[in-house]
Amino acid sequence: MGRYCGLVNDTSPSRYVVVVTHATRDDAFDAAAEFISEMAGRDIGCAVPDDQAKPMSSKLPGIDLESLGEFAHEAEVVVVFGGDGTILRAAEWSLPRHVPMIGVNLGHVGFLAELERSDMADLVNKVCSRDYTVEDRLVLKTTVTEHSGQHRWSSFAVNELSLEKAARRRMLDVLASVDELPVQRWSCDGILVSTPTGSTAYAFSAGGPVMWPDLDAMLMVPLSAHALFARPLVMSPAARVDLDIQPDGSESAVLWCDGRRSCTVRPGERITVVRHPDRLRIARLAAQPFTSRLVKKFELPVSGWRQGRDRHHLEETS
């Protein structure tokens, strides 16, 4: 994400917060500018990515912009204004530095986000007082290996990695193995390997189960597999998953990590997925259980269909 710049007052602050916004949404910059202004008034410095420094400074007259540089590693928390995609982008910076993230949802579902735009006062107060807890979540590490055994690409996934066919005309022929033992050879459109955090994202749309984020597990979901056994598999977090694109008849595939980083994978190559040594750190400002978040985000009908039908009947007869 490049060099970070600090928004500071006349004296150097003793505390720092990183702020990341959706790259193109003006309302995200407005919300971030309001937050940064509040932080500056409390002698807390804020940092923004290079590509966001200029548009942010235009919304913050009277607050000088200067290089943060060596202070970036002192950041207490990353505050993200946007949807889950923006949070996944911010994770590329926060994960290797072990800095927790707080998401402010300006998108649609926003499962990774902790707050809404209307919660700004609560956000400011709790960041200032460090009144939050931190969850450590499983992250995946993936490596692409050539037939010769040479590693040629690696990345990480907070939500999921998806192996997908590159061309519509043919299915992928993939052998899936767990802990170096073959499990299933699928002719399919692709295969997902997901974290519990990602189980409410692509894997959910593909028919996978919802997993509570404090569960340590790996989830494998075949995509449109032409097979009698094409069920999602939940595995140990210590498992090793190998996906071998068969050299006979398959074409190249594309491996995506969180829909952001990609690599072309050729027939005869292997994708290996293991637990990443780093954990994603998510800051929580409220003790809201995941069950409540699930019901709220997906608008699950917990009142029951009969209650809704009876209410509709009363409205018609009144």
From Swiss-Prot:
It holds the Pfam family NAD_kinase. One of its GO terms (biological process) is NADP biosynthetic process. Its cofactor is a divalent metal cation. Keywords: ATP-binding, Cytoplasm, Kinase, NAD, NADP, Nucleotide-binding, Transferase. It catalyses: NAD(+) + ATP = ADP + NADP(+) + H(+). It is an enzyme of class 2 (transferase). One of its GO terms (molecular function) is NAD+ kinase activity. InterPro entries: ATP-NAD_kinase_N, ATP-NAD_kinase_PpnK-typ_C, NAD/diacylglycerol_kinase_sf, NADK. The keyword ATP-binding applies. GO terms for cellular component: cytoplasm. The active site is at residue 84. It is found in: Cytoplasm. Its EC number is 2.7.1.23. PANTHER family: NAD KINASE. Involved in the regulation of the intracellular balance of NAD and NADP, and is a key enzyme in the biosynthesis of NADP. Catalyzes specifically the phosphorylation on 2'-hydroxyl of the adenosine moiety of NAD to yield NADP. Belongs to the NAD kinase family. This is NAD kinase. It comes from Cutibacterium acnes (strain DSM 16379 / KPA171202) (Propionibacterium acnes). The lineage of its organism: Bacteria, Bacillati, Actinomycetota, Actinomycetes, Propionibacteriales.
